[in-house]
Amino acid sequence: AQDKDLYNRAEKMMREDLLFTNPDFNRKEFVQALYTNEHYLTRALKYYTGMSIQDYIVHYRIDYAHTCLLIPDARSIEEIALASGFSSVRSFNRNFSEVFGMTPHKYRKEHANKA
Protein backbone atom coordinates (compact mmCIF):
# COMPACT_ATOMS: atom_id res chain seq x y z
CA ALA A 1 0.00 0.00 0.00
CA GLN A 2 2.88 2.35 0.78
CA ASP A 3 4.47 1.63 -2.62
CA LYS A 4 1.15 2.20 -4.41
CA ASP A 5 0.66 5.55 -2.67
CA LEU A 6 4.21 6.61 -3.49
CA TYR A 7 3.83 5.55 -7.12
CA ASN A 8 0.53 7.45 -7.40
CA ARG A 9 2.14 10.57 -5.93
CA ALA A 10 5.07 10.24 -8.35
CA GLU A 11 2.72 9.91 -11.33
CA LYS A 12 0.63 12.88 -10.22
CA MET A 13 3.72 15.02 -9.71
CA MET A 14 5.16 14.16 -13.11
CA ARG A 15 1.86 14.68 -14.97
CA GLU A 16 0.76 17.85 -13.20
CA ASP A 17 3.96 19.62 -12.18
CA LEU A 18 6.05 18.62 -15.22
CA LEU A 19 9.18 18.61 -13.06
CA PHE A 20 10.99 16.57 -15.72
CA THR A 21 11.01 19.61 -18.05
CA ASN A 22 13.78 21.11 -15.92
CA PRO A 23 17.10 19.73 -17.27
CA ASP A 24 18.52 19.82 -13.72
CA PHE A 25 15.71 17.63 -12.36
CA ASN A 26 17.27 14.34 -11.33
CA ARG A 27 16.84 11.31 -9.13
CA LYS A 28 17.85 13.18 -5.97
CA GLU A 29 15.45 16.08 -6.58
CA PHE A 30 12.61 13.66 -7.37
CA VAL A 31 13.16 11.81 -4.09
CA GLN A 32 13.21 15.11 -2.18
CA ALA A 33 10.09 16.43 -3.92
CA LEU A 34 8.21 13.29 -2.85
CA TYR A 35 9.51 13.46 0.75
CA THR A 36 10.76 9.90 0.59
CA ASN A 37 14.07 8.12 0.19
CA GLU A 38 15.68 6.62 -2.88
CA HIS A 39 15.15 3.03 -1.73
CA TYR A 40 11.36 3.39 -1.43
CA LEU A 41 10.98 5.28 -4.71
CA THR A 42 13.19 2.79 -6.55
CA ARG A 43 11.14 -0.11 -5.19
CA ALA A 44 7.79 1.51 -6.07
CA LEU A 45 8.81 2.44 -9.61
CA LYS A 46 10.40 -0.95 -10.30
CA TYR A 47 7.25 -2.70 -9.10
CA TYR A 48 4.72 -0.58 -11.01
CA THR A 49 6.70 0.35 -14.14
CA GLY A 50 9.75 -1.89 -14.28
CA MET A 51 11.88 1.25 -14.58
CA SER A 52 14.64 2.83 -12.54
CA ILE A 53 14.13 6.38 -11.28
CA GLN A 54 16.31 7.82 -14.06
CA ASP A 55 14.56 5.75 -16.75
CA TYR A 56 11.21 6.94 -15.40
CA ILE A 57 12.29 10.59 -15.72
CA VAL A 58 13.60 9.98 -19.26
CA HIS A 59 10.35 8.18 -20.14
CA TYR A 60 8.38 11.31 -19.26
CA ARG A 61 10.78 13.52 -21.20
CA ILE A 62 10.52 11.32 -24.30
CA ASP A 63 6.74 11.14 -24.04
CA TYR A 64 6.49 14.92 -23.73
CA ALA A 65 8.88 15.46 -26.66
CA HIS A 66 6.97 12.92 -28.75
CA THR A 67 3.75 14.86 -28.18
CA CYS A 68 5.51 18.12 -29.12
CA LEU A 69 6.86 16.58 -32.33
CA LEU A 70 3.34 15.65 -33.40
CA ILE A 71 2.15 19.26 -33.13
CA PRO A 72 2.71 20.99 -36.46
CA ASP A 73 4.42 24.16 -35.30
CA ALA A 74 7.66 25.90 -36.09
CA ARG A 75 9.55 24.75 -33.01
CA SER A 76 12.96 23.35 -33.78
CA ILE A 77 14.19 19.97 -32.58
CA GLU A 78 16.52 21.86 -30.23
CA GLU A 79 13.64 23.85 -28.74
CA ILE A 80 11.63 20.68 -28.20
CA ALA A 81 14.62 18.91 -26.66
CA LEU A 82 15.21 21.72 -24.17
CA ALA A 83 11.49 22.17 -23.41
CA SER A 84 11.29 18.44 -22.65
CA GLY A 85 14.06 18.62 -20.08
CA PHE A 86 17.00 17.28 -22.06
CA SER A 87 20.24 19.12 -21.43
CA SER A 88 21.36 18.73 -25.05
CA VAL A 89 20.07 17.81 -28.48
CA ARG A 90 22.59 14.98 -28.56
CA SER A 91 21.12 13.43 -25.41
CA PHE A 92 17.60 13.92 -26.80
CA ASN A 93 18.48 12.30 -30.14
CA ARG A 94 20.10 9.30 -28.44
CA ASN A 95 17.22 8.69 -26.03
CA PHE A 96 14.52 9.29 -28.65
CA SER A 97 16.23 6.94 -31.12
CA GLU A 98 16.43 4.19 -28.48
CA VAL A 99 12.65 4.35 -28.03
CA PHE A 100 11.42 5.04 -31.58
CA GLY A 101 14.22 3.58 -33.69
CA MET A 102 14.84 6.85 -35.52
CA THR A 103 15.91 10.41 -34.84
CA PRO A 104 13.33 13.02 -33.82
CA HIS A 105 13.95 14.81 -37.14
CA LYS A 106 13.20 11.68 -39.16
CA TYR A 107 10.19 10.88 -36.97
CA ARG A 108 8.77 14.36 -37.48
CA LYS A 109 9.37 14.13 -41.25
CA GLU A 110 7.65 10.75 -41.53
CA HIS A 111 4.72 11.92 -39.46
CA ALA A 112 4.35 15.08 -41.56
CA ASN A 113 4.18 12.94 -44.69
CA LYS A 114 1.26 10.98 -43.22
CA ALA A 115 -0.73 14.09 -42.37
Language-model regions, residue ranges each:
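Inter-domain helical "communication" segments and dimerization helices
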Residues: A1-T21, Y40, A112-A115
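Residues within helix-turn-helix
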Residues: K28, H39, S76-E79, V89-R90, ...
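Basic, amphipathic alpha-helical hairpins
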Residues: A10-F25, L45, T49, H66-R75, ...
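Short, leucine-enriched amphipathic alpha-helices that occur as contiguous helical runs
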Residues: D3-E11, V58-H66, V89
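Central "turn" residue of the DNA-binding helix-turn-helix
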Residues: Y35, G85-S87
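The alpha-helix within a helix-turn-helix
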Residues: V31, A81-L82, N93
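Terminal helix-turn-helix DNA-binding modules in bacterial transcription factors
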Residues: Y47-S84, E110-A115
